[in-house]
Design a protein with these regions (language model features):
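Short, electropositive alpha-helical surface patch
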Residues: 60-75, 157-163, 214-226, 251-258
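Catalytic pocket-lining loop regions of alpha/beta-barrel enzymes
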Residues: 117-234
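Alpha-helical scaffold segments that flank or form the walls of functional sites
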Residues: 23-71
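Active-site metal-binding loops of divalent metal-dependent hydrolases
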Residues: 9, 55, 166, 238-239
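Active-site phosphate/pyrophosphate- and oxyanion-stabilizing loops and adjacent acidic/basic residues
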Residues: 39, 66-67, 94, 150-151, ...
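Active-site gating/metal-coordination segments in enzymes
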Residues: 58-144, 151-153, 167, 198-207
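Mid-to-C-terminal alpha-helical segments outside catalytic/metal-binding sites
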Residues: 2-5, 28-49, 223, 227-234, ...
């Protein structure tokens, strides 16, 4: 039987002090989120494993997450962080690889001002190392990064890459600007067709209006499923960030609605099988 897997969630403790992006007064985000907070939702949904993803640009947070993973059976894998601009961090990558739940890394590219950062010569070693060590790369960005991710995934064809949050299409703006939707759709189709990258069906609600519905998300989910195919798409909650627009269960039900037209076998891929293969969770 295929495991049900949440391919993208976070645990954090703001008092640790390294979540530079986090608004200090946000009533939803600026509070601790720990395994005991998510466990009831996982049990209610029948989800056996999750992929715990970094939320701070520090090695210390990666170590913190691995400690949580050691004590939390539901955490199937951890996506951490290294400094791509510091070649000395190769030793961290090689050391972290020895942890049985360490799966790969995610640089916080969406927060980097230079859209061409990933093309810089001084960060190429990190992409090469991930490829050589057979570790996963979570691609976090916006539509403006699509062309550069295409370049990088072609440059490193053995890199095991997954696109986070469908590359964050700005759903709340697309109702009035169809050209933006077309730009995102074209870029995603090229990534799907010209590289072996995977895609997370996650983060869509956060990019939508507060009164979002599954119907609002359908063009985006449909494009991802059509372009990548269910065997390269994995559902993720993006909890607790999803709580900016709705609770865990609301997004899960919406995602199930968006995938209702798939066969049972394809739904099993999106809600577990793909993530299990990509992150090597059993």
């Amino acid at each position: 039987m295929t495991l049900l897997i949440d391919a993208h969630q976070h645990y954090w403790q703001p008092s640790r002090g390294d979540y530079g992006w986090m608004p200090k007064d946000d009533p939803v985000l600026s509070r601790p989120y720990l395994p005991q907070d998510l466990q009831p939702s996982l049990e209610a949904a029948g989800i056996s494993k999750t992929i715990l993803v970094q939320a701070a640009a520090t090695i210390e947070e990666t170590e913190y997450m691995l400690g949580i993973a050691d004590a939390t059976p539901s955490v199937g894998a951890v996506v951490g962080w290294i400094d791509f601009e510091n070649r000395a961090h190769l030793k961290h990558l090689e050391r972290l690889k020895n942890h049985p739940k360490f799966a790969g890394v995610r640089p916080m590219i969406q927060d980097i001002e230079d859209v061409d950062w990933m093309l810089r010569q001084d960060v190429q070693w990190a992409f090469a190392a991930l490829s050589d060590l057979d570790l996963a790369f979570d691609a976090l960005g916006f539509s403006r990064h699509l062309a550069n991710f295409l370049t990088m995934f072609k440059r490193f064809p053995k890199l095991r890459a997954v696109i986070d949050h469908c590359m964050k299409p700005q759903i709340r703006n697309h109702n009035g600007t169809r050209s933006e939707l077309a730009f995102w759709s074209h870029g995603m189709a090229r990534l799907a067709g010209e590289t072996g990258a995977y895609c997370k069906l996650s983060g869509l609600v956060t990019e939508a209006n507060e009164d979002w519905s599954a119907e609002d998300l359908a063009p985006y989910a449909g494009q991802v499923l059509s372009a990548f195919g269910p065997s390269r798409v994995m559902w993720g909650s993006d909890w607790p960030v999803c709580r900016l627009r709705g609770e865990y269960e609301e997004w899960l039900v919406a995602a199930q609605t968006l995938c209702a037209g798939l066969s049972q076998a394809d739904r099993a891929e999106v809600f577990g099988g793909t993530a299990a293969r990509f992150y090597r969770v059993s």
